[in-house]
A protein has these predicted regions:
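A short acidic, glycine-rich active-site loop
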Residues: 62-77
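Short, flexible loop segments at boundaries between secondary-structure elements
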Residues: 148-154
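Small/aliphatic-rich secondary-structure junction motif
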Residues: 3-62, 91
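Structural beta-alpha unit
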Residues: 1-9, 36, 81-118, 155
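General small-molecule cofactor/ligand-binding pocket signal
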Residues: 44, 94-98, 149
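Short, hinge-like loop/turn segments at secondary-structure boundaries
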Residues: 58-62, 112-114, 136-137
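Glycine-rich, Arg-bearing micro-motifs that act as flexible, cationic patches
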Residues: 117-139, 153
């Protein structure tokens, strides 16, 4: 009698990161899941254009292309470092840097990569903070066609 290998349901896991402690915790969970499922990770960091909607923001100088390149280079270095760490734990990992609204970009990447799961850290903001600042995790959970795992920061 031959034994059938267990099904691998989580082949591609997209992990959104803002490089926070909370995002690192979410990445650790994602690495563990991918490792146990024989899956792959795709890390995503989204850079946002400075908000110009408020008077204070409008008074600030808009970053020139040199500043944008510095932001991109710093983010690429962090993504590559985090991908190497996941690879050392035996999980094939790729990464991507995007510009735009984080929730929209993560949903777009998850669909394009045919992700089985999206993993995000969540900071547990108050209702007022969510109303004023929004919540990337909340928006992804609400709008994504792909299942989403949110990981809270350790208290």
């Amino acid at each position: 009698m031959t034994q059938k290998a267990p099904a691998r349901f989580l082949k591609m896991i997209v992990v959104g990161t803002d490089f926070s402690v909370c995002a690192a915790r979410a990445l650790s969970f994602a690495v563990s899941i991918a490792s146990s499922q024989g899956g792959k990770l795709h890390l995503v960091h989204v850079l946002m254009e400075p908000v110009q909607a408020f008077d204070v923001a409008a008074a600030l100088p808009y970053p020139d292309s040199g500043v944008r390149k510095e932001w991109e280079e710093a983010a690429r270095e962090r993504l590559a470092r985090e991908a190497r760490a996941a690879e050392r734990r035996g999980v094939a990992t790729t990464w991507e840097l995007k510009w735009g609204r984080p929730s929209d970009a993560l949903i777009e990447v998850a669909e394009a990569r045919k992700a089985s799961l999206v993993v995000l850290g969540t900071h547990g903001r108050s209702a007022l903070e969510k109303m004023l600042l929004g919540s990337t995790a909340e928006r992804v959970v609400r709008l994504s066609a792909v299942p989403v795992l949110t990981v809270r920061e350790k208290k």
